[in-house]
C-alpha cells in the first residue's frame, strides 16, 4: 500500500536584524549579495540578471537597479542595519551603496575590500583603440 503524500511544511523565514552587503563591481558587471553576519546569503542580484546586457551591464545605473532588487528582497527578513563591503574597480561602486541607502537600511560602515597584489600576476596589456 502506498504511503499518503506528506504535506509540504511552510518554510519559516528567519528574522535577521544586522547584515552585510557585498558589492563586487568589476569592469563588466556588478554583483550585490546581502548576507547575515555568518555569511549565509539572504538575497542577491546582478546587473546582467536585472535585464541589462552587453556594455549596459557595466553602467552605474545597472548597479543601482541590482542593488535595489537585492535590497528589496532582503527586506523580507526584517533586515535593518547593513555593513557594506565593496570590492573591485568597477563603475557601479558608489551608485550601489547609494541605492542600498535609499532602500531604508541604516548603513553602519563602508569598507573597501579590493584585493591588492604585492606585485603578483602580470596585468593585462593596455588597450589600443
From Swiss-Prot:
Family: Belongs to the universal ribosomal protein uS11 family.
Quaternary context: Part of the 30S ribosomal subunit. Interacts with proteins S7 and S18. Binds to IF-3.
Pfam family, one: Ribosomal_S11
Organism annotation: Pseudomonas syringae pv. tomato (strain ATCC BAA-871 / DC3000)
Disulfide pairings: none
Keyword Transmembrane: no
Gene for this chain: rpsK
Entry-linked Gene3D superfamilies: Ribosomal protein S11
Descriptive protein name: Small ribosomal subunit protein uS11
GO molecular function, one term: rRNA binding
Matching InterPro entries: Ribosomal_uS11, Ribosomal_uS11_bac-type, Ribosomal_uS11_CS, Ribosomal_uS11_sf
Amino acid at each position: 500500500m502506498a504511503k499518503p503524500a506528506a504535506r509540504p511544511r511552510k518554510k519559516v523565514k528567519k528574522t535577521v536584524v544586522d547584515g552585510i552587503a557585498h558589492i563586487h563591481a568589476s569592469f563588466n558587471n556588478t554583483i550585490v549579495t546581502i548576507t547575515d553576519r555568518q555569511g549565509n546569503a539572504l538575497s542577491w542580484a546582478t546587473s546582467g540578471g536585472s535585464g541589462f546586457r552587453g556594455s549596459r551591464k557595466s553602467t552605474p545605473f545597472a548597479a543601482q537597479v541590482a542593488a535595489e532588487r537585492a535590497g528589496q528582497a532582503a527586506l523580507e527578513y526584517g533586515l535593518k542595519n547593513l555593513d557594506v563591503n565593496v570590492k573591485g574597480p568597477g563603475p557601479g561602486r558608489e551608485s550601489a551603496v547609494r541605492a542600498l541607502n535609499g532602500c531604508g537600511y541604516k548603513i553602519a560602515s563602508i569598507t573597501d575590500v579590493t584585493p591588492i597584489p604585492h606585485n603578483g600576476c602580470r596585468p593585462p596589456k593596455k588597450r589600443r583603440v
